[in-house]
Amino acid sequence: MSEHRQALGRYGEELAVKHIRQAGLTVLECNYRCPLGEMDIIAREGETIIFIEVRTRSTGSRGWGEESITAKKRERLYRIATHYLKYRNYKEWPSLRFDLIAIRCQDQEGKQPDIIWIRGI
């Protein structure tokens, strides 16, 4: 992955964290890694644990972030969430939700990125 894409991804994740904190969620972890992959953000809203995938794009030439979650990716996110709950010693299975935050950073001077939060993907 190019340095530009990595920097864009980090920027998007930072924006997403600010956005979900402003919405009143508690961020539990960022960039949770396990043998099955990585979860961008894990947060809590009340009693619900939310696993959040962040997709940041600067152009729609390959599709926007909200168009990029496949069934295979969704399944991998579920497996990572199961790993997280098991290895964080949750005694009971909490209420879960999987969200997507898509960030569009179009190159228009002075324009704030568009943040699209899709709950329950």
From Swiss-Prot:
One MF annotation (Gene Ontology) recorded for this entry: nucleic acid binding
Gene3D superfamilies: 3.40.1350.10
Parts of the chain that traverse the membrane: none
InterPro entries, per the entry: Restrct_endonuc-II-like (IPR011335), tRNA_endonuc-like_dom_sf (IPR011856), UPF0102_YraN-like (IPR003509)
A Pfam family: UPF0102
Family as reported in the entry's similarity comment: Belongs to the UPF0102 family.
NCBIfam families: PRK12497.1-3 (NF009150), PRK12497.3-3 (NF009154), YraN family protein (TIGR00252)
The protein's name: UPF0102 protein DSY2577
Lineage, top ranks: Bacteria, Bacillati, Bacillota, Clostridia, Eubacteriales
